[in-house]
Amino acid sequence: MKSLLTLGTLILISVSHAVAQQTSLQELVNHAAKTTIDRFAPQKLEEKQLSITLIDLRDPARPVTASFRGNERIYPASVSKLFYLVAAQRWLEDKKIEQTPELTRALRDMIVDSSNEATQYVVDVITHTTSGYELPPKEMEEWQHKRNAVNRYFASLGYTNININQKTFCEDAYGRESVSRGPNGENRNKLTTDATARLLMEIVTGKIANPARTALMMDLLKRDYSGRSSDTDDQGAGFTGLAFKGREGYRLWSKAGWTSTTRHDVAYVETPDGGKFVLATFTTDHSRDREIIPSVARVVLDGIKDVK
């Protein structure tokens, strides 16, 4: 009887340990969220203004995902350009569009410089639509169907709860772009941190494109976080990369986005001790609080090594 009790105790401990391992990444994400919300309480940061998704890629064949409000639909700003990059590479691979010097230049400027004008050109090419004056209802319906090509592509891959069919602008949309967006912005681009982190993970692991196109995308997303840029909104040094200050040996690939009301980043990080993870952090109504995103990243950097 005693041996049976001992065996039962060992099994219980083993099961409990397994459960703890399964939830530890989620606990890290919860801790990152709570720590950041508490730190920025004086700035009135609330739960509803923060979304986080973390994907542990130490075993790329078995990625583990945890999130905090990861399925909330949020205006993504320039993070949407990551989706247009992937769509363009897929279209090129499938020979739906042609590689031209202008498209090559635009894809580079869209990701490296986060150029809105380059993005507008890329959207024209991959959806076969153009901006301009308002169209009659029937023509507008046909135009909108074409513009939804990127949505249909990602839906075919199982992406849900997102909308990617709008150009990015420095100021505002006019004509058919404004009509498409809707009078109350109901058709604006929307992403979740879950979908965004998944996409970067699929780029990194080579699941979304062939090796040559994967290498091309990774090259465009590679960031220098050394702080040499004087731009506080530099994609390498002004977002997740801020968390690397005082740390050595890290590598960073990312796509950031920001407006007057939003500040986001999705980053793939490789640590000196072999850690690999994707971290997507979206914030709303705190675009001037540049430390929120690196605050989340620091907690993850400090805790990811302890996740089993």
Model-derived features with residue positions:
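Short, well-structured active-site flanking segments
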Residues: 90-108, 119, 210-214
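N-terminal leader/targeting segments and the immediately adjacent pre-domain N-terminus
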Residues: 3-69, 92-97, 140, 144, ...
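Active-site-adjacent helix/loop patches that line small-molecule binding or acyl-intermediate pockets
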Residues: 24-35, 47, 102-181, 189-194
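Structural recognition of the beta-strand scaffold that forms the well-ordered cores
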Residues: 51-54, 77, 109, 121, ...
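Structured C-terminal helix/loop/strand segments within mature extracytoplasmic catalytic/sensor domains
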Residues: 21-36, 44-49, 188, 192, ...
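Solvent-exposed loop/turn segments at secondary-structure junctions
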Residues: 58-60, 73-75, 116-118, 128-129, ...
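Short glycine/serine- and small hydrophobic-enriched flexible loop segments
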Residues: 86-94, 124, 198-205, 302
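Active-site SXXK
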Residues: 75-97, 110, 279
